[in-house]
From Swiss-Prot:
GO terms for molecular function: protein-arginine rhamnosyltransferase activity. Pfam families: EarP (PF10093). It catalyses: dTDP-beta-L-rhamnose + L-arginyl-[protein] = N(omega)-(alpha-L-rhamnosyl)-L-arginyl-[protein] + dTDP + H(+). Changing residue 193 to A: Reduced protein-arginine rhamnosyltransferase activity. Changing residue 252 to A: Reduced protein-arginine rhamnosyltransferase activity. The active site is at 17 (proton acceptor), 273. It comes from Pseudomonas putida (strain ATCC 47054 / DSM 6125 / CFBP 8728 / NCIMB 11950 / KT2440). Keywords: Glycosyltransferase, Transferase. Belongs to the glycosyltransferase 104 family. This is Protein-arginine rhamnosyltransferase. Changing residue 191 to A: Reduced protein-arginine rhamnosyltransferase activity. Changing residue 273 to Q/A: Abolished protein-arginine rhamnosyltransferase activity without affecting substrate-binding. Protein-arginine rhamnosyltransferase that catalyzes the transfer of a single rhamnose to elongation factor P (EF-P) on 'Lys-32', a modification required for EF-P-dependent rescue of polyproline stalled ribosomes.
Length: 377
């Protein structure tokens, strides 16, 4: 009999939380043959990344996953063999009580946010006894072999390589999004939160020697583009040109198409957790817009990742990359930082590829979770 898994997702950051849990659920079904229920409290955040999904359905099957609406008024269900609470979400009290009542309590995992901070290695896999007698285990994704690794489907990098080696596949995909490539242009994707340095970066792109084609999926940063252009709201399909820069607004796409978008671009600026990991697998230079926390607590998390990611760069390229990421996240001059990074482009390209290869040498997150469960039996 298949092991049953329940994954609970409370949507906080629009698409980041559901993005991670939806990828995980799909992979557990497709590659490990598990029976997975994904509980989501806001299906409106789920439907944009899963075409054909119904935001009003209490239950639906998508890609082999039993997707359930997590209602405010909980209805009794039998707990699964493995229960994952994503990102410290609080499970329904009645469900937890049903877990306790099982003859063999489920494996209860708290899937934490991704972090490169040193303390993660020491906390990964730690049990947390609960007052009701159950035991919850902290499971941390991460960038070292002492963590749970990163989400990565088994065929991902082979599919990426095949796509990137086919100019026709890239052209056809982009045309399907309504993108007619500007000849000789640097192709950039931008998926970000509001950012005070956006205008400085756009100015640098518009005045650069090489043309640039900026692809912007629907999202929070689009309003900043409209402001920079000095016009009303931009809509999907709109294309505007200023100087050397062409800006184009794209529709929100499925996760698989978002991967292809990242693979298609020469540079990817991303936000949150899911797109952050997928940009790393794209093997192209990238920039992460980290989620802002009170008292700039996110800066420590940013610097922890950079301490890993920068290893192996020359001193000059290292300084340029560090300057670019700090400018975008700490409100320094993004125009100057971008021009400095462009001076080291070949090295940054090679480094991005090598980083992905090093991460791929470690077990992926879904496999690590399955092994953890099997070892617990």
């Amino acid at each position: 009999m298949k092991a049953t898994w329940d994954i609970f997702c409370s949507v906080v950051d629009n698409y980041g939380d559901i993005g991670v849990t939806w990828r995980l659920a799909r992979q557990l079904v497709a590659e490990h043959g598990l029976a997975v229920r994904l509980w989501v409290d806001d299906l409106n955040a789920f439907t944009p990344m899963c075409p054909g999904a119904d935001a009003t359905a209490a239950q639906q099957w998508q890609h082999g996953v039993d997707v359930r609406h997590w209602p405010a008024a909980w209805l009794p269900v039998a707990p699964a063999d493995v229960v994952i609470g994503a990102f410290a979400c609080q499970l329904p009290a009645a469900y937890v009580e049903a877990m306790r009542a099982r003859p063999q309590p489920p494996l209860w995992l708290n899937l934490e946010y991704l972090s490169a901070e040193d303390w993660v290695e020491g906390c990964h896999g730690l049990p947390s006894p609960q007052p009701n007698g159950l035991r919850k285990v902290f499971f941390f994704p991460g960038f070292t072999d002492k963590t749970g690794g990163l989400l990565r489907e088994g065929s991902l990098l082979a599919r990426r390589d095949g796509f990137q080696q086919s100019a026709e596949a890239r052209r056809a995909f982009l045309q399907g999004l309504g993108v007619d490539l500007v000849p000789g242009a640097l192709l950039i994707s931008l998926f970000a939160y509001e950012n005070p340095q956006l205008g400085n970066w756009l100015d640098a792109l518009a005045t650069a020697d090489q043309p640039c084609h900026l692809l912007v999926p629907q999202g929070r940063v689009v309003a900043g583009l409209s402001q920079w252009l000095g016009e009303g709201p931009l809509h999907v399909g709109d294309v505007r040109t200023r100087g050397a820069l062409t800006v184009q607004v794209l529709p929100f796409v499925s996760q698989d198409d978002f991967d292809r978008l990242l693979w298609s671009c020469d540079f990817n600026a991303v936000r949150g957790e899911d797109s952050f990991v997928r940009a790393q697998w794209a093997g192209q230079p990238m920039l992460w817009h980290i989620y802002v926390q009170d008292e700039n607590a996110h800066w420590e998390k940013l610097e922890a990742f950079l301490a890993h990611y920068r290893c192996g760069l020359s001193d000059d390229a290292d300084a340029a990359l560090l300057g670019l990421w700090r400018a975008w996240n700490m409100d320094f001059d993004m125009g100057q930082a971008w021009r400095a990074a462009r001076q080291h482009w070949p090295e940054l390209q090679q480094h991005a590829r090598l980083w992905g290869a090093r991460q791929a040498a470690q077990p992926d997150l879904a496999t690590a979770l399955v092994h953890f469960y099997r070892n617990s039996l």
